[in-house]
């Protein structure tokens, strides 16, 4: 089930946020997992405090076994960003990639963070005997006590089809790259690099929107790494419903993209 970020302002502008009541689907215990990209992709906005509080309340009061997987790759582009993992550490598996922030896309330099005490391990421990027997058979070549294996260790083994667990993980060049990137960030006490990246992203975003003639409302939750533009919203504001109908019946979104690419060669 997909939950769409369809909330809009009274003036008809997108906020690219979820409707809080739409999150109530997560209250159903039959919903086992929630996958979140925060900040989002492609709109590139972080969750509001209200949405974060709603998720926390749902987990604590309605669905305590909800497994949350959050991709926080764009987090560094929002000052004072706070991850779902900070609010619900035991329920959350956090994925973070170095690639966007350090311009190393393609290398797949990423880490997975999981709290030592987590719902994933708890759910495995509470599986029925038949399922546990299946898992013992699957991971039996790795441990004499499969029942004590952590979820994250099982996941690493699964990445190499279990049998090749001894080759799991990134190769040395990728490990060294991540070590250097992380060390660089820790040593940059003044966040000089981060400020430079924020200025670069914001200048690119401004250049895009200035040339569209559209208005980009201020929003402290905007990462700005990507931008999603609803052409029909602006068509309606500038030219009315008849023009919107003409656009929808005459063109498709790719026409705009290809024309933009052609005219900027």
What are the functions of these language-model segments?
Residues 1-265:
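PLP-dependent class I/II
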